[in-house]
Amino acid sequence: RLNIPDVRVENGRVLFSGDENALARANMNLRTGERVLLVLADFKATTFEELFQGVYRTNLEDFIPKDGNFPVKGHCLNSQLMSVPDCQAIVKKAASKRLGEKYGVSWLPETGAKYQLQFSIMNDRVQLYLDTSGPGLHKRGYRAVGNDAPLRETLAAAMVQLTRYRGRDFVWDPFCGSGTIPIEAALIARNKAPGMYRRFAGEAFAWIDPSVWGDVRAEAKDKEFNGKYRILGSDNDPKCISLSIANARKAGVADCISFRDGDATKMDLPAQEGVIICNPPYGQRMMEQKDAQRLYAAFGKHVR
């Protein structure tokens, strides 16, 4: 729990209000969110001039310093303005004019920290954001290399959360690949912040005191649990098992997970009850469809 008030759910996103501490806690602790974006402006625009003026009116100087590097990216949907490259150019031009006038310069060097601007134009409504995360939050920092069909860490965490797992049950991923599902289960069991081993774009922002991030990391560390957990990851590829063990070590949860090389349709399990969470081969990248169908049938008989 992040103890953040005023939370509102919309299609594909969650909105909340808060200060710099809330922003840092969200980046550090969100398991299934992909980015934490700060809303800078919200306005209607059906023409390039309206888009320009909306961005130009935004107090960008409160967030982007004189030497800030502010690239622009975004997307458009069901709107009069549908050309993303043109909208990018307009947003960049308006932001440059605003910042240049506020700082009294005709040219902005953009040699400092990165302040990624994003825009969303949907149904003629423009929202301008500042990306505080940097690389997507699925990049926890523990998986340097994945297998041939890696599962995003955020999706793996969501799968574990859907089972309401809290560390008490036996958990088995019979097709663990690079170990993402068992590792995310262990992070949840330990109450370990998923962002503990990575950095965020917001750590370089001039308007956020560095102590905020240090305090948030210390707070997250204090909330970790220590215990014995029954989490098993298995795969019939020894290379995947070696990779899983290495990733679990980097995530700081190697002591919480057992990894085993073996056939999921024949493996003896250490528990009669528990939860199976997996991303099985489905006949696209890892094997043929007929082979996947035979695997499902054999696996179903084995665990019945």
Enumerate the predicted regions with their spans:
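Low-complexity, glycine/alanine/valine/leucine- and proline-rich hydrophobic stretches
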Residues: 259-260, 276-278
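S-adenosyl-L-methionine
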Residues: 4-34, 76-86, 121-168, 183, ...
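Non-catalytic nucleic-acid substrate-recognition regions in nucleic-acid-modifying enzymes
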Residues: 2-115
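Glycine-rich S-adenosyl-L-methionine
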Residues: 287-303
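Conserved S-adenosyl-L-methionine
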Residues: 151-268, 285, 291
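Residue-level signal for inorganic ion chemistry
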Residues: 72, 119, 279, 299
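A short acidic, Gly/Pro-enriched loop at the edge of an enzyme's catalytic core
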Residues: 265-277
